[in-house]
């Protein structure tokens, strides 16, 4: 009996403990079922939310391009980020982000974009962006090397071509020296003009070089009556008058020769002083008008022969002695303003805004309408 009572007590305690465990298991299973039901409901809600289409502007690319052309790069970047947050499947917009960062030379933004793509595990887009970034970086290095080589070549050419420039200056000075010779010839021609009374005043005009008909006998009579006032030039004046009277009597009608035309071209017009002769009172019988068929008279100027001085000098041919054009003939056909525009654009891509602005401001007056529009776009790019 002593052993039966504790055995019964232990049996009752065991039964009570078993009942409690069953109740706890039942309550835990009910909690698990409730959690499963809640998870199923949340997943169904997520699927329904994913199935609902995201409304995105179909002309998003045109809007982004328009903002980039205007120069509002920050607004374009904000629009791209907003679109990617609403629809992460638009992978082509990541390339737009890369272009914007390259335009702004934002290396930090490019690194953040690459890290974001690595976290999202978008390996295809990441490979495209890394390849494009590598190509643009290589192109910038090539352009920088080309610009440095051009500047070095220009400096070397200017250093080596300085003796040729001095020689060209000397050649131009030698071409301009014959001017005093012409002055000397004109002075000599003026000193050779004799002062006796003219035989007959002849009105010379540029349109007609012929002289009206005159009576030779009257000219000879006037030549006999000529008296020279200065005593020093007596001999020279007499010889000159005789030569003129002979040539007036023997010369056929013809136009002025080539020497006279050359002298008109090389010499200025010399106004001969008109000397009034005193009237001679001689009994003259009334003239009888008889028409004589005499050849027309042409007057010739008698000047001492001057070798090569009376011929018109040919126009001096200006030879371009620019050492750059001699070394690189293709530079003569280049448009400097267009070249400066392209160079300014390269400076902007490299980040040298100050030098690009200097180039655009220097050539603003030389630009055409299209070039002005391009320069305004470049200035907007720098300002943004």
Curated annotation (Swiss-Prot):
Disruption phenotype: Deletion of the gene results in dispersed T4P localization. It also results in diffuse, cytoplasmic localization of PilG and FimL.
InterPro entries: FimV_C_sf
One GO cellular component, as annotated: plasma membrane
Keyword terms of this UniProt record: Cell inner membrane, Cell membrane, Membrane, Transmembrane, Transmembrane helix
Record-annotated membrane-spanning stretches: 1-21
Region (Disordered): 27-46
Its membrane topology: Single-pass membrane protein
Location in the cell: Cell inner membrane
Domain of life: Bacteria
Function: Localization determinant of type IV pili (T4P) machinery. Plays a role in regulating T4P positioning by connecting the Pil-Chp chemosensory system to subcellular T4P localization. FimV likely recruits FimL and PilG to the cell membrane where T4P are assembled.
Name of the protein this chain belongs to: Type IV pili machinery localization factor FimV
Upper lineage: Bacteria, Pseudomonadati, Pseudomonadota, Gammaproteobacteria, Moraxellales
């Amino acid at each position: 009996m002593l052993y039966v009572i504790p055995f019964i007590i232990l049996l009752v305690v065991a039964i009570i403990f078993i009942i409690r465990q069953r109740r706890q298991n039942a309550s835990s299973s009910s909690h698990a079922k409730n959690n499963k039901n809640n998870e199923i409901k949340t997943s169904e809600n997520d699927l329904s939310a994913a199935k609902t289409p995201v409304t995105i502007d179909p002309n998003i690319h045109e809007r982004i391009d328009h903002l980039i052309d205007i120069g509002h790069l920050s607004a374009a970047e904000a629009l791209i980020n907003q679109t990617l947050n609403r629809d992460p499947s638009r992978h082509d917009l990541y390339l737009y982000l890369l272009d914007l960062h390259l335009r702004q030379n934002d290396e930090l933004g490019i690194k953040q974009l690459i890290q974001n793509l690595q976290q999202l595990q978008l390996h295809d887009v990441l490979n495209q962006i890394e390849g494009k970034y590598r190509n643009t970086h290589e192109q910038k290095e090539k352009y920088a090397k080309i610009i440095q080589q051009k500047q070095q070549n220009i400096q070397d050419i200017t250093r080596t071509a300085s003796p040729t420039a001095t020689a060209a200056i000397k050649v131009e000075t030698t071409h301009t020296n014959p001017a005093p010779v012409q002055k000397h010839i004109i002075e000599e021609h003026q000193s050779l003009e004799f002062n006796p009374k003219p035989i007959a005043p002849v009105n010379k005009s540029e349109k007609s070089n012929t002289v009206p008909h005159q009576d030779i006998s009257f000219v000879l009579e006037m030549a006999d009556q000529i008296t020279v006032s200065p005593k020093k030039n007596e001999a020279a004046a007499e010889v000159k008058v005789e030569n003129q009277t002979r040539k007036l009597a023997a010369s056929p009608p013809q136009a002025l020769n080539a020497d006279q035309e050359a002298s008109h071209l090389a010499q200025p017009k010399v106004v001969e002083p008109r000397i009034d002769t005193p009237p001679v009172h001689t009994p003259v019988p009334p003239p009888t008008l008889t028409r004589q068929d005499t050849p027309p008279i042409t007057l010739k100027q008698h000047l001492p022969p001057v070798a090569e001085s009376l011929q018109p000098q040919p126009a001096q041919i200006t030879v371009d002695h620019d050492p750059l054009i001699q070394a690189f003939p293709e530079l003569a056909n280049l448009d400097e303003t267009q070249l400066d525009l392209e160079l300014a654009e390269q400076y902007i891509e490299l980040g040298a805004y100050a030098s690009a602005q200097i180039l655009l401001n220097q050539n603003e007056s030389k630009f055409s309408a299209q070039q002005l529009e391009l320069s305004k776009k470049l200035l907007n790019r720098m300002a943004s």
